[in-house]
A protein has these predicted regions:
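Extracytoplasmic beta-strand/coil segments of soluble accessory domains associated
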Residues: 65-109
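C-terminal beta-signal and adjacent terminal beta-strands/loops
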Residues: 468-470, 561-570, 576, 588-629
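A beta-strand signature from Gram-negative outer-membrane beta-barrel systems
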Residues: 122-162
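Short, acidic, small-residue-rich periplasmic hinge/interaction motif at the N-terminus
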Residues: 17-57, 95, 132
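Gram-negative outer-membrane beta-barrel transporters
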Residues: 328-331, 335, 369-376, 466-468, ...
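Outer-membrane beta-barrel signature, preferentially recognizing the C-terminal barrel domain
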Residues: 260-279, 392-394, 399, 403, ...
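Face-selective signature of the C-terminal outer-membrane beta-barrel domain
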Residues: 228-245, 264-407, 412-416, 458-464, ...
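Periplasmic-side early beta-strands and strand-to-turn transitions of outer-membrane beta-barrels
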Residues: 136, 152, 160, 182-265
Length: 629
């Protein structure tokens, strides 16, 4: 309620002074870059939301997942612990249907198809954007059309030569050290080291139990280094990440301090990507090269149960190349793109065979713009073939999407249809004892109708949508309770509404979002779980961010509400997870070369969990000092 009161007082003031503000936004500084980004976003036909640099700096957030959770239609799965894996799900389509792109190049994981957003820092980003379906612009790669939803991470280009250093200390013995050197507008080098003990207390209470304990085996040590070079139309981005962490596991009733998970994980990730884009009159060209090398080592050694002992290393590589060309004539444009990806996976598991995959995609897009009308249609052809012992059959598929919008003054009416699929991952097909080489692709279809309003200080988006997922890939017991296998089983449908509001006035920025969705299981009309809610899909969720920027001061208050969620496929088996509300605050002040920031997350110390029996931290603090030379 207190956040609503802030909104009710600030928004009328915005309306009263909107035209004066509009004149001020021609000034180029960090405070007013929000409007610049939003203006560019209105050129896209598909629904989209953006968090800009000004909001990123003011948020009490540490990684990309912390920023995305405030966007409409987004669900974050956080597997507890300060170093727990964080994946994103958009409109209940599944995390493997969400493509994450860094400067237009996809971050991939051929092994399991998901991206851990906790590994990617916000410190080097200019903006984080979410597009339902995909962007609608020339020179997109074919891979960008292959996702049901897309997240774009835009790297921040430096504007001067500077050395930035920072140190942060927070709850649970959390230390962060950051160093960034930028040279003119040519590029930067950014490094960060993080350590946390992660031993936060928790209280888990249900109708049947009341458990109090301390999270064990939740420590994390991680180091990240990345650089980016800008040379005219050329951009070269290199990323390196290494971590050593504990995997705390789900809590055990009344025994949380006696039986501690001992799983440990070592991660090492590297990629280097080179992209070039230029225009020659009506022609446009784009080329991309990328190489990635990822290694994961997992070990668990339970003294009291040797049957679950594990010590395995996974190694995967990825090489990617793409070329796109576009041509425009008056109101018509055409774009052709083709890319090729080579991925391989090795593991020191018994009976595991080396496998590599060749994945080729080709897309043809047609754009038409006339006055306020914008039309776009794309056809995508995918060919995928694996090479290993007893390999799965090659895959050939054609999918398409169509988008349309009409703009009249400040109003835009839009709609899109998109059909796309995900290829079974290498784990789905070949994982020892569980993989199934006969799996079919998992298809999604989406229909969206919405409108947007954009005028001076205010932007509003409202969308209604329908989607369904066919042939869901799930792991089910096939030969008794001790033999599980990957199967195509499941049909779900989702009806939803997304609302987002952005308002900017002088020193105030307000961002509101809300989602309603009805996501149901429609697999087997005779089954007990037919028409039950899909696991971890809340019906209602809301978020609000208020940011204040004035001279050297910055402050933000963010609040997020998530409705109750069922966590079992059959809703009657157990009670749903409780709804939760989480509030974060952050205050900062900059004087010349020094910035001091203080933040508090989960201000009211509300216990909650995103995943069943994976409690999240309660109230926690952090103080940060930053130096600029």
């Amino acid at each position: 309620m207190w956040l609503a009161a802030v909104v009710m007082n600030v928004v009328p003031a915005m309306a009263q002074h909107a035209r004066a503000v509009h004149g001020q936004q021609l000034v180029t500084d960090s405070v007013y870059q929000l409007e610049e980004v939003v203006a560019r976003g209105t050129q896209h036909v598909s629904p989209h939301q953006t968090i800009t640099r000004a909001q990123i700096d003011a948020l009490a957030s540490n990684n990309v997942a912390d920023a995305l959770k405030y966007l409409a239609g987004v669900q974050i799965k956080d597997y507890g612990g300060l170093g727990g894996q964080k994946t994103v799900n958009v409109r209940s389509l599944g995390s493997q249907h969400v493509g994450v792109y860094l400067d237009g190049v996809r971050i991939t994981n051929a092994q399991n198809g998901t991206v851990d957003l906790g590994k990617y820092s916000l410190s080097t980003l200019e903006a984080v954007s979410l597009f339902n379906a995909n962007k609608t612009e020339p020179l997109m790669t074919a891979s960008e059309y292959a996702s049901a939803a897309t997240i774009y991470l835009k790297t921040r280009r430096p504007d001067s030569t500077a050395l930035h250093a920072g140190y942060s200390y927070g709850s649970f013995n959390t230390h962060k050290v950051n160093l960034n050197y930028s040279y003119h507008r040519l590029g930067f080098l950014d490094m960060q080291y993080t350590h946390t003990d992660g031993d936060y207390p928790f209280h888990y209470h249900t109708e049947y139990e009341d458990t109090t304990g301390t999270r064990r085996n939740s420590d994390l040590d991680q180091f990240r280094a990345e650089s980016c070079v800008f040379l005219g139309p050329l951009q070269w981005h290199t990323y390196y990440y290494i971590s050593y962490r504990g995997l705390p596991g789900g809590i055990v009733r009344r025994l949380s301090d006696l039986y501690t998970d001992v799983g440990r994980e070592w991660d090492q990730n590297f990629f280097s990507q080179l992209s070039w884009q230029d225009h020659f009159g009506s022609f446009g060209l784009r080329a991309i090269l990328k190489y990635a090398n990822d290694r994961l080592h997992y070990r668990s050694d339970y003294d009291y149960n040797m049957s679950v002992h594990s010590n395995v290393t996974y190694h995967q590589q990825d090489a990617y190349g793409a070329v796109a060309a576009s041509y425009s004539y008056k109101d018509l444009g055409v774009s052709l793109s083709s890319d090729l990806r080579w991925s391989d996976l090795t593991a020191d598991l018994k009976h595991f065979s080396y496998v590599y995959r060749l994945d080729n995609k080709t897309s043809l897009s047609v754009f038409y713009r006339w006055k306020g009308l914008a039309l776009n249609a794309t056809g995508l052809y995918t060919y995928c073939r694996d090479h290993t012992r007893r390999q799965a059959d090659p895959l050939h598929r054609f999918t398409w999407d169509a988008m349309a919008s009409y703009t009249l003054g400040d109003w835009t009416l839009r709609t899109f249809y998109k059909s796309v699929f995900r290829i079974p991952t290498l784990n789905d097909l070949y994982y020892t004892l569980v993989g199934n080489r006969s799996l079919r692709p998992e298809y999604t279809k989406q229909v969206d109708v919405g409108f947007s309003y954009s005028h001076d200080w205010l932007q509003v988006q409202l969308d209604g949508y329908y989607n369904h997922v066919k042939d869901r890939i799930v792991c089910l017991p096939l030969k008794g309770s001790f033999q599980w296998s990957m199967l195509n089983y499941g049909y779900t449908r989702c009806l939803g509404v997304d609302l987002s509001v952005n308002a900017t006035f002088k020193h105030h920025i307000i961002m509101l979002s809300g989602t309603f969705q009805d996501d149901r299981n429609r697999t087997n009309p005779g089954g007990k779980d037919y028409n039950d809610f899909v696991a971890y899909a809340p019906r209602w969720s809301f978020s609000a961010i208020y940011t204040f920027l004035w001279k050297g001061w910055s402050a933000s208050v963010s609040d997020m509400f998530v409705d109750k969620r069922y966590w079992t496929a059959q809703n009657s088996v157990d009670d749903p997870l409780d709804a939760y509300n989480c509030t974060d605050v952050k205050v900062g002040y900059t004087y010349r070369w020094l910035t001091v920031e203080a933040e508090c997350q989960n201000l009211f110390d509300k216990p909650y969990e995103m995943i069943q029996r994976w409690p999240m931290p309660g109230r926690r603090y952090a103080v940060t000092m930053k130096f600029t030379l």
